[in-house]
Design a protein with these regions (language model features):
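Beta/alpha (TIM)-barrel catalytic core signal, keyed to glycine-rich beta->alpha loops juxtaposed to Asp/Glu
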Residues: 7, 146-250
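Conserved, mostly hydrophobic/aromatic
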Residues: 43, 55, 79, 94, ...
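Acidic-and-aromatic substrate-binding clefts and catalytic sites of carbohydrate-active enzymes
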Residues: 60-63, 82-91, 114-120, 147-153, ...
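N-terminal secretory signal peptides and thylakoid transit peptides that target proteins
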Residues: 1-17
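C-terminal segment of N-terminal export signals and the immediately downstream linker at the start
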Residues: 23-53
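Alpha-helix-loop-beta-strand connector modules within alpha/beta enzyme cores
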Residues: 95-108, 163, 167, 236
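Distinct, well-ordered alpha-helical segments
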Residues: 68, 91-99, 119-130, 150-159, ...
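Active-site groove signature of glycoside hydrolases
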Residues: 133-149
Length: 250
């Protein structure tokens, strides 16, 4: 009887281990699925179906191609860069990492066009980014960190965009911003049909009631209670909206 009990005990123990192992494997699988992109959404009038989480590259440094590959493997297909990020190294890393996979992603770059910037300067900036990115076009090219309507009103930017689109170097354009005059700049860009896509800072702090809880000054990103209105206007005009600083980070 004791031998039978021992066999039953061992059998039950083995079965329990198998069940426990299967449960852990199931949990690991669920965790892995949870670390992947959950859905893709249309980016406004561009028609691009982009991942619900994008890859920002402002701190991407040489030798970090593996981070780009990790993002690709998890379903991210929207990669955001700029000519100023890590002195151009960020775009170089993106270009290296996306070699052979360019047609699987949407690639974004940005440059700063000022009120007095000439088209020739913008052409040079775009071409330099294309070389670093190892591609002949970008899907989205943005006027970077705009906080002055005069930067958007510069006719050289509009002419540059028109010519670059015609040449197939840019598919969509717009602006990015996160400073004090963001709403005025967005209003101007949308009202004058200067943006297919906008990249804006947006987070829980946009709710004015949130700030009423505090007596000190807070994050410069969010003191713009009119931002929800202008983002709704963007939606009505089919302008794609991408958000950044969603956790109020830098």
């Amino acid at each position: 009887a004791s031998g039978m009990d021992r066999r039953r005990f061992l059998k039950a123990g083995t079965l329990g281990a198998l069940v426990s192992g299967a449960a852990r494997a199931s949990d690991a699988g669920a965790a892995d699925r949870g670390n992947r992109v959950q859905r893709y959404r249309r980016l406004g009038r561009t028609g691009f179906e982009v991942s619900d989480i994008s890859f920002g590259s402002s701190r991407l440094r040489r030798g970090e191609e593996h981070l780009v590959h990790m993002a690709l493997d998890r379903g991210i297909n929207y990669f955001d860069g700029a000519d100023s990020y890590t002195g151009g190294a960020s775009e170089t890393v993106l270009g290296n990492a996306l070699k052979g996979r360019r047609d699987q992603v949407y690639l974004v770059s940005k440059t700063k066009s000022w009120a007095g910037t000439r088209r020739s300067e913008l052409d040079a900036a775009l071409n330099a980014s294309l070389r670093r990115l190892r591609t002949d076009y970008v899907d989205v090219y943005l006027n970077h960190a705009v906080n002055d309507v005069e930067r958007l009103a510069n006719p050289e930017w509009g002419e540059f965009v028109e010519r670059a689109k015609a040449a197939g170097k840019i598919r969509a354009t717009g602006m990015s911003g996160h400073a004090g005059h963001l709403v005025a700049c967005l209003d101007h860009a949308i009202d004058h049909d200067l943006a297919d896509v906008v990249l804006v800072a947006y987070n829980f702090g946009q709710d004015p009631a949130f700030y009423e809880q505090f007596t000190r000054g807070f994050d410069y990103v969010a003191k713009q209670p009119d931002l929800p209105r202008v983002l709704e206007k963007a939606r009505q005009n089919d302008v794609g909206v991408v958000t950044m600083k969603t956790l109020m980070g830098a």
